[in-house]
C-alpha cells in the first residue's frame, strides 16, 4: 500500500512538472541557472551540425512548439535526464486489460495514461512562450559589384500554433551592425553572447551558410532572452524599420497590394516584439494598412484599422495622427452605413479648438511625408 502511495505521488509530481515545463514558467525553469537558461549553446557550430542544418534551409518552415521540439538541438540531449519517462511501454490498451500487470507497474501505467491525455490536450492549446527564430531560406544575391547572402528568418511568437509567422530578410552586414551597436551600448550583457566571425574566403559555401544560419538563430534567441537587450531600440529597429521603409516606399509609388503585405508583416512583428518605445510606429503601420485597404476597395478592413488606431490614441488630442484617423473613420463609416457620430463630434471639437485644420490632412498625405528613422 505504501508503495502504491509513493508511485501515485511520483506520478502527480511528474505530471505537475511536465505541465509547468510545457507552459514555460514552472519550477523546472526556476531551478536552472539563469546563464544556462539564456545561453543553452554556443553560436559557433561544430562541423557535424552543418549537414543537419542544411536540410532545414529548404525554404519550408518547420513549426515547433514549446511541448514538441525535435530540431536536434544539443540542449535537448543535455536536458534529458532520469526524470524522463516513456509515454508507453509498447503494450496496447487491449493487451493491458487482458493481462493485468503486477502491482508495481500500476503506478507507471497510470502515469503514462495521464501524460498521454495531457499531451493530446496540450498540443492544441499551448504555444511557445518566447519568440523563436528559424532561417527558412538563404539565397546568394548577385548585385554587381556586390555579392551577398540574404537570410530569411521566420519569427514565431506566442499565439495559435497555426498562426502564420512574421518574416524578415537580412544579410550578414545587418546582423554585424546590430551586434556592434549593442556591444557598444551593453558591454556586460553582450559579453556572453557569441557572434559568427567574418571570413575572408568561403563565404558562399553551403557549409558556411548553414553554420551562419544556425548562429543567427541562436544570436537573436539569446538577445530576446535578456530583458535589457530585448527592449533595446537598436533591436527593435533591426526587426521593424526596414519593413516600414519598404512598405512606405511601395505605398508612395502606388503599389498598394505589395505594400499591404509589408505593412501587415510589420504589424505582426511589432505585436510579437512589443513596442516599449511608444505607439508611433504601430500607429504609422495602421495608417499604412488603412490607406492600402482603402485603395484596394476594402473599406471594412480600412475602418477596422482606424478603430484600432483610435483605441491606441485614447485621449491624446495633440497627436498629429488623431484628426486624420478620425476623418478617415467618419468617411468610411458613412460609406458603409455605420454609426459615425462619436468620431464626427470628436473631430469637430478638435477643429473648434484650433488643434487641426479644416479639413485635416489625409492619412495618405501624412504617410508620404513621414520620415522613418
Swiss-Prot record:
Residues 55-65 have a biased composition (Polar residues). Residues 129-246 form the PX domain. Keywords: Cytoplasmic vesicle, Endosome, Lipid-binding, Membrane, Protein transport, Transport. Pfam families: PX (PF00787). It is found in: Cytoplasmic vesicle membrane; Early endosome membrane. It is a peripheral membrane protein. GO terms for molecular function: phosphatidylinositol phosphate binding; phosphatidylinositol-3-phosphate binding; phosphatidylinositol-4,5-bisphosphate binding. It comes from the Eukaryota. A 1,2-diacyl-sn-glycero-3-phospho-(1D-myo-inositol-3-phosphate) binds at residues 171, 173, 198, 212. Residues 1-107 are annotated as: Disordered. GO terms for biological process: protein transport. Highly expressed in fetus liver, but only weakly expressed in brain, skeleton muscle, smooth muscle, and cardiac muscle, kidney, and adrenal gland. One of its GO terms (cellular component) is early endosome membrane. CDD domains: PX_SNX21. Transmembrane segments: none annotated. Residues 21-37 have a biased composition (Low complexity). Residues 66-81 have a biased composition (Acidic residues). The PX domain mediates specific binding to membranes enriched in phosphatidylinositol 3-phosphate (PtdIns(P3)). Monomer. Belongs to the sorting nexin family. Binds to membranes enriched in phosphatidylinositol 3-phosphate (PtdIns(P3)) and phosphatidylinositol 4,5-bisphosphate. May be involved in several stages of intracellular trafficking. PANTHER family: SORTING NEXIN 20, 21, SORTING NEXIN-21. This is Sorting nexin-21. It comes from Homo sapiens.
Amino acid at each position: 500500500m505504501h508503495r502504491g502511495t509513493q508511485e501515485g505521488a511520483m506520478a502527480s509530481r511528474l505530471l505537475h512538472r511536465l505541465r509547468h515545463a510545457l507552459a514555460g514558467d514552472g519550477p523546472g525553469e526556476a531551478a536552472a541557472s539563469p546563464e544556462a537558461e539564456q545561453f543553452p549553446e554556443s553560436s559557433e557550430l561544430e562541423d557535424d551540425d552543418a549537414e543537419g542544418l542544411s536540410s532545414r534551409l529548404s525554404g519550408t518552415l518547420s513549426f515547433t512548439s514549446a511541448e514538441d521540439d525535435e530540431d536536434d538541438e544539443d540542449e535537448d540531449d543535455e536536458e534529458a535526464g532520469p526524470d524522463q519517462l516513456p509515454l508507453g511501454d509498447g503494450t496496447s490498451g487491449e493487451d493491458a486489460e487482458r493481462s493485468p500487470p503486477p502491482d508495481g507497474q500500476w503506478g507507471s501505467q497510470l502515469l503514462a495514461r495521464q501524460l498521454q491525455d495531457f499531451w493530446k490536450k496540450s498540443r492544441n492549446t499551448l504555444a511557445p512562450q518566447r519568440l523563436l527564430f528559424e532561417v527558412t531560406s538563404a539565397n546568394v544575391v548577385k548585385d554587381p559589384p556586390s555579392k551577398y547572402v540574404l537570410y530569411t528568418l521566420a519569427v514565431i511568437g506566442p499565439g495559435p500554433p497555426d498562426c502564420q509567422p512574421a518574416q524578415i530578410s537580412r544579410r550578414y552586414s545587418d546582423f554585424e551592425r546590430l551586434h556592434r551597436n549593442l556591444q557598444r551600448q551593453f558591454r556586460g550583457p553582450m559579453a556572453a553572447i557569441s557572434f559568427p566571425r567574418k571570413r575572408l574566403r568561403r563565404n558562399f559555401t553551403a557549409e558556411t551558410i548553414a553554420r551562419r544560419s544556425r548562429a543567427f538563430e541562436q544570436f537573436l534567441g539569446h538577445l530576446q532572452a535578456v530583458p535589457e537587450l530585448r527592449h533595446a531600440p537598436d533591436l527593435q529597429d533591426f526587426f521593424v524599420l526596414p519593413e516600414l521603409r519598404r512598405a512606405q516606399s511601395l505605398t508612395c509609388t502606388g503599389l498598394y497590394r505589395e505594400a499591404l503585405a509589408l505593412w501587415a508583416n510589420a504589424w505582426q512583428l511589432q505585436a510579437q516584439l512589443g513596442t516599449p518605445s511608444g505607439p508611433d510606429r504601430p500607429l504609422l503601420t495602421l495608417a499604412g494598412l488603412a490607406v492600402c485597404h482603402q485603395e484596394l476597395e476594402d473599406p471594412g478592413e480600412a475602418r477596422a484599422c482606424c478603430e484600432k488606431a483610435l483605441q491606441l490614441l485614447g485621449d491624446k488630442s495633440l497627436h498629429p495622427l488623431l484628426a486624420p484617423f478620425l476623418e478617415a473613420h467618419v468617411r468610411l463609416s458613412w460609406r458603409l452605413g455605420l454609426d459615425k457620430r462619436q468620431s464626427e463630434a470628436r473631430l469637430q471639437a478638435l477643429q473648434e479648438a484650433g488643434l487641426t485644420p479644416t479639413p485635416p490632412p489625409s492619412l495618405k498625405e501624412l504617410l508620404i511625408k513621414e520620415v522613418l528613422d
